[in-house]
Amino acid sequence: MKSIVLIFLKFWQKFISPLYPSSCRYYPTCSTYAIMAVEKYGVLKGLIKAFFRVLRCNPFFKGGVDYP
């Protein structure tokens, strides 16, 4: 399961993400954060952390460096 999620996230980074303008307010980017979180915490907890990270990636939050 973990490898399937990681393949999807890497596919997103390589093929889908370049179609949108770069707008992530954090370093590392949200998709890189998701990959790191899934590798560190497993699929369920990693995706939950990534979900809340994406919710924070908006003009109301300052952004900055945020590692999982």
Curated annotation (Swiss-Prot):
Pfam families per UniProt: YidD
Cell inner membrane found in the keyword field: yes
Membrane topology summary: Peripheral membrane protein
Main location: membrane
UniProt keyword list: Cell inner membrane, Cell membrane, Membrane
Subcellular location: Cell inner membrane
Residues spanning the membrane: none
GO cellular component: plasma membrane
NCBIfam families recorded: membrane protein insertion efficiency factor YidD (TIGR00278)
PANTHER family xref list: MEMBRANE PROTEIN INSERTION EFFICIENCY FACTOR-RELATED
Entry's family note: Belongs to the UPF0161 family.
Protein name, UniProt field: Putative membrane protein insertion efficiency factor
Lineage of the species this protein comes from: Bacteria, Pseudomonadati, Aquificota, Aquificia, Aquificales
